[in-house]
């Protein structure tokens, strides 16, 4: 039984609604909601994932910016379970406040045009998030999960992997959506690391080092990081200044950012 409804996709909001039952079921299986958990879906759209999750779990919070979807979501959810709708831009939502002491599980088919800002916003509230299951452009998921030496290993890879375990789960083809996007999508799982295992002393300093390193990725670190690191930083961290950012492990960036010179 599918309770999703029909509504026109808005290009301005980057909307592509998932419509293929096979992939909907795979996402719900990947999330595997359990009693007592607090599920929060970002951008429910026509309810393709919303209603199967609600039917399985009984309660769900959704964050939807498109006001034209609020009433249809409310009406369709009424006979299924308890649906709480937060009508707001997701980047303005305080996930820590939404969690209210119970870590939330974030789920969503993220709008292509703001997927990276949403990921970094979720990281800002990592202490209130148990895990995340997101569908994004496959290209973005490839970057998120990439390792050193890969052509797509970059700032997004390092920033996310420093704070989360990142696992690419499966690819979703364009034909699974209405309207179909021009590229493949993929589902990814992110599990925030325990705070004690994230050894970053200064989050801003770490972000600055990573940004500078990949901002000029063809240059050696000595040149790319000239505004944020001195030669002594490399020596103390055990990082070669003649290496390039794409050659460094996440742990190398953390050590480099953590160095405090006297």
Curated annotation (Swiss-Prot):
Its EC number is 2.1.1.182. InterPro entries: KsgA/Erm (IPR001737), rRNA_Ade_diMease-like_C (IPR023165), rRNA_Ade_Mease_Trfase_CS (IPR020596), rRNA_Ade_methylase_Trfase_N (IPR020598), rRNA_adenine_dimethylase (IPR011530), SAM-dependent_MTases_sf (IPR029063). Keywords: Cytoplasm, Methyltransferase, RNA-binding, rRNA processing, S-adenosyl-L-methionine, Transferase. HAMAP family: 16SrRNA_methyltr_A. It catalyses: adenosine(1518)/adenosine(1519) in 16S rRNA + 4 S-adenosyl-L-methionine = N(6)-dimethyladenosine(1518)/N(6)-dimethyladenosine(1519) in 16S rRNA + 4 S-adenosyl-L-homocysteine + 4 H(+). It is an enzyme of class 2 (transferase). This is Ribosomal RNA small subunit methyltransferase A. It is found in: Cytoplasm. Its main location: cytoplasm. S-adenosyl-L-methionine binds at residues 16, 18, 43, 64, 89, 109. GO terms for cellular component: cytosol. One of its GO terms (molecular function) is 16S rRNA (adenine(1518)-N(6)/adenine(1519)-N(6))-dimethyltransferase activity. It comes from the Bacteria. Specifically dimethylates two adjacent adenosines (A1518 and A1519) in the loop of a conserved hairpin near the 3'-end of 16S rRNA in the 30S particle. May play a critical role in biogenesis of 30S subunits. Coiled coil: none annotated. Belongs to the class I-like SAM-binding methyltransferase superfamily. rRNA adenine N(6)-methyltransferase family. RsmA subfamily. GO terms for biological process: rRNA methylation. The keyword Electron transport does not apply. It comes from Xanthomonas campestris pv. campestris (strain ATCC 33913 / DSM 3586 / NCPPB 528 / LMG 568 / P 25).
